Amino acid sequence: MASEPASLRDRVRELFALERDVLVLSVAMFAFSLGFQMASRYLGEYMVALGASAVVVGLYGTFSNVISAIYPYPGGAISDRIGSRYALTMFGFLSAVGFGVWLLAPAFGALAVPLIFVGLVFAQAWKSFGLGATFAIVKQSVPPARLAEGFASTETFRRTAFLVGPLLAAAVFAAFATTDTGSMADAQVVDAFVYVLALAVVFALLGTLAQHVLYDSGDDDFGKAFEGISQVADDLRNLPPELRPLLIGDTLVRFANGMVYVFFVLVVTRFLGVGLSTTLPVVGTIDLSPQAYFGVLLAIEMAVALLTMIPVAKLTRRVGLKPVVALGFAVYAIFPALLIAAPADAGVLAALFAFSGLRFAGLPAHKALIVGPAEQGAGGRVTGSYYLVRNVVVIPSAALGGVLYGGLALPGVGTFAGSPPLAFGAATVVGLLGTGYFLVFGEEFAAVNG
């Protein structure tokens, strides 16, 4: 009888493909993602409240894309060389510093918006620098045929934080709102978001500490030393051929998402201006500003993602990875058009964000399709190479989205009158092109059925 509890734990761990290192990684991802999601999804609103225009918000998104393009490859190479434990510890600490810069930005007056850009250099370190390290840990810990389930375990922990984080942010915004369901004043947005960022700093430090203390680096799979730009070129030339159709389709879909991602919060809080007023048993009447309701919408999105991610990951063992990845791409593509055309109704927005959660169901399969063909010991570099190409192409997407969203006036040239519907409609067209390309030319990873 004494062995029964351990056996039950083993079965639960097996269900989620949670080897020890993957479990530790998942716990760290939960803590860090809790803070990052609370902060990053509201940054467009924060910047506008600090005085930024839509074009500047778009430039912020493009700067984020630059960092996403630059960080993953050296991050993967560092992980392959020094091991995932020390790499992720360093990246996590840098991210906490970035959150702190965002927190202090309003105190610097006219420099507040530029400091948002400075803070991003640090804040995105764990997310982008650590990408190769997180992929490599799963790659070396989980059998090839179960990669989708291994990634599903880390994604489930991370997405659980993505559910809890926005609810915490919503509670903070609700505490600072002075109107029932009307949009908050800019000063109120700034005051509330400073507290959100303080929580983000705490969670980032906790995640970094947990990962460093609990992770067993004895099984780290070390690669060769980084050989400079020539190695980057070699890795790109040697990218497994199965990845090329996925890379092209994925790049188009992510370009589309990048055009509008930083503007989702502005559509809810300022373009549609949708809050929530409802009565619940025991609790009574609840009135949420659009800023607070956006956090609830993000939680709804993540709830759907969590409910579907593990079952869909297991489904890949029957239907393969490609159909699941294509489903995620399709949801990415059509969501912008659906959102911008939605009526200013809280229930409709809740349904749309629930639909958007389906895009995350394909992420574990997508990651398995990326890292599956990689040789052991090179998982970090293959992942970094893939994301390097994708993220370089996606760099201008947010700036383009900002121009289409808010328009642009150039002295001596003229004025381009953009609009939110124009930006979101164009994003859907680009996303559908990427989805169609992958459906026609995408390949399956043979180990799934092997």
What are these regions (language model features)?
Residues 201-221, 434-442:
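C-terminal membrane-cytosol helix-exit motif in multi-pass small-molecule transporters
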Residues 71-83, 173, 307-320, 405:
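Helix-to-loop junctions at the C-terminal end of transmembrane segments
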Residues 93-110, 330-344:
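C-terminal ends and interior cores of transmembrane alpha-helices
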Residues 7-67, 242-297:
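Helix-loop boundary and gating motifs at the non-cytosolic
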Residues 119-160:
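Cytoplasmic helix-loop-helix junction between adjacent transmembrane helices
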Residues 2-7, 212-235, 445-450:
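Flexible cytoplasmic inter-helical loops of multi-pass small-molecule transporters
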Residues 112-130, 347-361:
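Hydrophobic core of transmembrane alpha-helices in multi-pass small-molecule transporters
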Residues 174-201, 405-431:
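A membrane-interface helix-boundary motif in multi-pass transporters
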